[in-house]
């Protein structure tokens, strides 16, 4: 009878402990799922990013110049064309009409840093535009959108028109964030959106950006140290390549205006010499006291003095022109890189969490198991004493 009661009690102990078993198993499973999920997430994010950048041939390096990129700049950069595919383009920061919202308008690329079309199509002719996809709830295809722009240093607008017809909505392969798009030289100073227009919409003698996609890292994982090291090496090479270009470009910029000033100075000196001769002749002949002759000579002297002042101002203005600057950016350093950096950082955060969070869950599960088993043993010890008695 006692044996029967004993086994009945054992079965009852197991059945009454189902909740404890399920709780411990759930905690262990949660730790396992967290471990697997967090370990898998960073590689998946990196794979997704790599596939996206490869599909759109996102530029590994970009080069910009404060005075744009003229033919001599292009000839210099084309020296690395055997190592990289190079594409030149335009961009301009503008302000959405009747607001302070800054937009960056890019020229439509051919092959490098292309766009993902979310809805509609890319612009194909002048006067058309595709907006960033975050604006598809505010605008629809076929709507008109207008911008205003600040004049360039030459007093001219860079854009041929400022009102466009929306043809679609896109996502950039360079600007990954939809919230923090970086700073802007227009409007409030904070970039609110971007758009792409045909290259023919720009009216500029120089390109504004060069994009380089290197062949040795074309399909590489951009989140690896190998990719970083290779791109860093290419960046150093480009910086050395453009090191002397600021002085050369400044000399180039000043050449024609300086030649014009020198020519005008020479002509002025000739005119001044002729005037002095006429003045001496007038004095010799006594005509210098003639009111009419005096008036003509005085007018000529005033004109020469005015011309001298104009030449002086032109020379001072020319001398004040600063050397242009050239900037070489990686994907992480570009002025619109916030989204890229955030994506990379998030992948790294998940990687770090995968090394910590599951351990905490396993520790909690072990602690709960220890406490539960301790109580269970204590209960069974009491029952064992009862049976023994």
Task: Give the residues covered by each predicted segment.
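Membrane transport/envelope proteins' first extracytoplasmic loop
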Residues: 3-363
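Interfacial "coupling" helices/loops that link adjacent transmembrane helices in transporter permeases
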Residues: 9, 17, 367-389
């Amino acid at each position: 009878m006692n044996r029967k009661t004993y086994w009945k009690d054992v079965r009852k102990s197991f059945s009454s402990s189902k909740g404890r078993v399920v709780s411990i198993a759930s905690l262990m499973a949660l730790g396992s799922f967290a471990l697997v999920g967090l370990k898998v997430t960073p590689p998946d994010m990196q794979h997704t990013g790599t596939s996206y950048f490869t599909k759109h041939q996102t530029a590994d390096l970009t080069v910009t110049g404060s005075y744009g990129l003229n033919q001599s700049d292009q000839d210099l950069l084309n020296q690395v064309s055997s190592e990289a595919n190079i594409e030149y383009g335009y961009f301009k920061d503008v302000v959405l009409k009747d607001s302070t919202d800054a937009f960056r308008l890019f020229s439509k690329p051919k092959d490098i840093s292309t766009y993902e079309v979310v809805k509609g199509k890319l612009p194909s002719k002048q006067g058309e535009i595709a907006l960033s996809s975050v604006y598809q709830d505010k605008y629809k295809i076929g709507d008109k959108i207008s911008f205003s722009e600040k004049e360039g240093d030459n007093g001219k607008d860079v854009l041929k028109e400022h009102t466009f017809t929306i043809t679609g909505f896109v996502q950039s392969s360079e600007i990954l964030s939809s919230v923090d798009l970086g700073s802007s030289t227009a409007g409030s100073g904070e970039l609110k959106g971007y758009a792409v227009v045909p290259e023919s919409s720009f009216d500029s003698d120089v390109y504004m950006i060069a994009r380089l996609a290197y062949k040795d890292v074309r399909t590489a994982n951009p989140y690896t140290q190998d990719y970083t090291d290779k791109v860093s090496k290419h960046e150093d090479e480009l910086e050395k390549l453009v090191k002397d270009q600021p002085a050369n470009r400044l000399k180039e910029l000043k050449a024609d205006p300086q030649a014009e000033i020198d020519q005008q100075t020479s002509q002025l000196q000739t005119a001044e010499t002729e005037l002095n001769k006429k003045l001496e002749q007038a004095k010799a002949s006594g005509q210098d006291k003639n009111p009419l002759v005096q008036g003509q000579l005085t007018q000529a002297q005033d004109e020469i003095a005015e011309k001298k002042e104009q030449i002086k101002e032109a020379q001072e203005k020319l001398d004040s022109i600063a050397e242009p600057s050239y900037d070489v950016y990686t994907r992480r350093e570009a002025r619109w890189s916030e989204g890229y950096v955030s994506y990379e950082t998030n992948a790294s955060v998940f990687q770090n969490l995968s090394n910590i969070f599951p351990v905490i869950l396993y520790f909690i599960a072990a602690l709960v198991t220890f406490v539960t088993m301790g109580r269970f043993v204590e209960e069974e010890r009491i029952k064992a004493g009862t049976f023994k008695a």
